[in-house]
Amino acid sequence: KNDGRVMADFMNNTVDGTDIVMKSAGDAQRAFCYITDAVRAMMIVLLNGDKCDSYNVANEDEPMKIREVAQILSDIAGNKIKVIYKQENDTGGYCKYVRVGLDTTKIRTLGWNPKIKLLDGLKRTYNSFIAE
């Protein structure tokens, strides 16, 4: 809880039924990757990757703005929670880049590509928390 990362914090809000409070306009765009896609990527690199090389893992097929993720989570929760914009002057902990693009070409040449769409991953995660 409250680990400061947008996905974990927003998901906790959604599961707890508390409003998502945006600390910025939410214009930053990220390429979230579902855990099974990330694990598959690690296994592919472990088995087929070049020794001592690095590979970017991200779902570059679906870059999404932070505010869009917040709205999707509100929708998943049946609109029981609201997305509230309360910009703070001190955004020192946030990345200043609107878009951080990761080139996934190298890992894709090994045969990896993301399989889980962001919406499906968010629904799966939400449902797994609700089922607990």
Regions found by a protein language model. Give the residues of each.
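Flexible, glycine-rich beta-alpha linker
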Residues: 1-7, 29
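C-terminal substrate-binding subdomain of Rossmann-fold SDR/epimerase-dehydratase oxidoreductases
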Residues: 14-132
